[in-house]
Amino acid sequence: MHTTDRFAPIRALMMTDVYKLGHIEQYRLAGTPEIVYSNWTNRGSRIDGVDHVVHFGLQAFLIKLGDWFAPFFAADEDLVCELYEERLAQILGPNTIGSDHIRALHRKGYLPLSFSGVEEGTPVPVRVPSFVFWNTDAEFFWLTNYIETTVSAEIWQPSTSATIARELRRVLDEGAVRTGSDPAAVDWQGHDFSFRGMSSVETAAASGAGHL
């Protein structure tokens, strides 16, 4: 889709918590790390009797992540650095963080990150990681938690919807057995009618996929 947004090449770099723009220098206050690990761990449940969360949404997120950063890697190196510094100046003031690490990432040509997790659809106990991710090049230690913001924003909805749907399916299946009802009717009883109540089409798609 055509866009007139001249900041489009760095849009993905702005999809983070603002303090993480300075993570590279914050980490260095304690030395220079090589590998930074992060994890996705559901810390608790708000549903009585539910102590597992269905892992779902990571594969879709990784595809999106690649799409988001494609304009960055396709753009001119000097342009992305100029745009990044211009945007930083608008947010934090001039000459704050710099763009050398952004230039290095552009020259790398891809996101040096690795993800490892359980199979999608697996119920994972609360307080146990569903997946972990880390930087595969020591120079980009800052990148792991830089993208953690989008990880959180993209994963919680589909995994939560999948968890709720799993619990509802259990209740409906048990009810069908207890009342002697046709088990095939459960597929209709548990259909997803949430689209109209979602915040966006994208949210509805993520939630609907989790429900299925």
Question: Where do the model's predicted regions map?
Answer:
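Outer-membrane beta-barrel transmembrane strands
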Residues: 116-118
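Buried, small/hydrophobic-residue-enriched core segments of structured protein domains
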Residues: 4-47, 105-112, 121-124, 130-212
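Low-complexity, highly charged intrinsically disordered N-terminal segments
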Residues: 36-97
